[in-house]
Amino acid sequence: TMLVGQAQAIEQTFSYLSIFSGIQDLSASSGALSSKSNYFNSLEGEHGNLKESRKVQPLVVGFDFYRASGSVASGFGIEILRYKKLFNFSDGSQLSLEALGVLYGFNFYYRGDFWFPFFGFGTGNYTSKIQEAFYASDSLTESTIFGQVDTPLYYKLGARIPLNSWGIVFSQQFISADLDVASSNKHIALGGTSTLFGLYYGF
């Protein structure tokens, strides 16, 4: 009598809660995604050079749920990010930019022995508040503009390094989220390229 056994990969479900931050460059290319930002360039032509870089520091909270079969896993993720920055021009004009983004999509993991590299892509929503204080002919004009990007696109690459239930996560994201600024009929990039580091808890 001969017994034949069949080995099957056991499916497991995992969830990650993450918090991370880093640098998001609004002027950088969105990788393979298109962008048509020209708002800041137009303002520099009118109000002089921008004194700060177009880099912001977002705070990001993310939740990932995925199913693993062996060393391969796939699932769904959502991230909520927020940033705010004040920009100054050489003629004294100022611009305050505040954005709140919700990004969601699919993630794919490889579960290695010491790290879990991943790739993700998806869409979401951005809302923004722009406060303009611009000088022209010795007079100051102030305005507040609210806007929304309904279908931003993103993709990301990164890895998680598990340390028992906790771990370290780093990610590079490419986001195309161009907002039409009604006051100037120009486009401002709310996305760009971001490099993020943080911690996660798995359960």
Give the location of each predicted region:
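Short glycine/proline- and aromatic-enriched beta-strand/turn motifs that initiate or cap beta-hairpins
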Residues: 8-76, 85
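Flexible, solvent-exposed loop segments that connect beta-strands
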Residues: 27-53, 81-101, 127-149, 178-190
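Residues on the lipid-exposed face of transmembrane beta-strands in outer-membrane beta-barrel proteins
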Residues: 59-67, 102-112, 121-123, 155-163, ...
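Repeated loop/turn-to-beta-strand initiation elements of outer-membrane beta-barrel proteins
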Residues: 70-76, 114-117, 163-170
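Trp-centered recognition loops
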Residues: 150-154
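Outer-membrane beta-barrel "beta-signal"
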Residues: 16-18, 163, 190-203
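C-terminal segment of classical bacterial N-terminal signal peptides
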Residues: 2-8
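Transmembrane beta-barrel strands of outer-membrane/channel proteins
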Residues: 17-25, 76-82, 119-125, 170-174
